[in-house]
Amino acid sequence: ATLWEQHASENSSADFIYKGPAGEEIKFIFNTFGYRLKKIRGTVPYRRLGLYTDYPFAPLLTGTGCPFSCAYCASSALQRKFARRETSEVVQEIREFYDSGVRDFAFYDDALLFDPDLHIKPILKAIVGAGLNARFHCPNGLHARFVDDDLASLMRASGFKTIRLGLETVNRGRQKQSGGKVTSGDLEHAVQVLKRRGFAKEEIGVYLMYGLPGQGLGEVKEGILFLESLGVRIHLTEFSPIPGTEYWRVLVENGIVGEGTDPLLTNNSVFSYLFSGYDPCEIDQLKVGVKKYNFEDFRERRGQTR
């Protein structure tokens, strides 16, 4: 219960509430209940436990935590340190999955592209060198700032099929306020590089947030028009306030949330409707418009094949 520890303590009736990642610190829990662990053996990769069979896809996590501290993100609260696995270990994991029949891989890192020359590029070069005919997907938002021609070439050669870039907003002031990890210029450059290397609209998606503190729908509409001009898929994402983040502090100061707030009310599916001051009909219209735009090329291709 790392994010909602107090709420869990007051409402769960649990004997013990643990906060933080379940690593070596887990020994403390056993000690609390009178158990003494003499030794903790090294962890065995789950793929070697005999439980992962006949799956066509596999998740990949090459590191935990994030070197950035965005105002809306809880990554630094969940993982206080940014740590990465050895690239050789990651490549070995991919090869073992591949040998077992897996062809689709999904990266779930919060900062997969950070320091690319020392991490993701060596991984992709090894994949290309091994001749693996695999497909890679990145559902988490990638940092557009790190996408250069060399990286885009490696992503194309290694089989990337799903690319998601994080923009969140086109408002320059809010970009700086929320962490400064990316600018609209960074994103535009990344998209141009990716397209130059052969990636199509349906392979490049960009996350655009709505419901941020103080954000009007006009700003969201401006972001939609910007992304349409770049010819990428648009993924509207609802803001959800998370305890421990900068935006949570802002909302507490403004009296919108507090210690007594029910976690269900902060869910992204309802928060923007309840607390952002938006017209629900206008939000729905935006979503419909984005959906139509996203599938324009699909309908055109389908019409051409008839």
Positions of the model-derived regions?
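Glycine-rich beta-alpha loop elements in corrinoid/cobalamin-binding modules
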Residues: 1-42, 238, 244
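Radical SAM [4Fe-4S] cluster-binding motif and immediate context
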Residues: 45-201, 210
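Short catalytic/ligand-binding loop motif for oxyanion handling, primarily in non-cytosolic enzymes
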Residues: 3-9, 25-28, 69, 114-116, ...
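Catalytic cores of alpha/beta
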Residues: 5-12, 150-151, 213-228
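C-terminal accessory regions of radical SAM enzymes
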Residues: 203, 218-306
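Short, hinge-like loop/turn segments at secondary-structure boundaries
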Residues: 12-15, 34-36, 124, 154-155, ...
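Conserved beta-strand positions in the central sheet of alpha/beta enzyme cores
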Residues: 18, 106, 164, 235-236
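Glycine-enriched alpha-helix->loop->beta-strand junction motifs that scaffold or abut catalytic
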Residues: 13-14, 156-162, 229-233
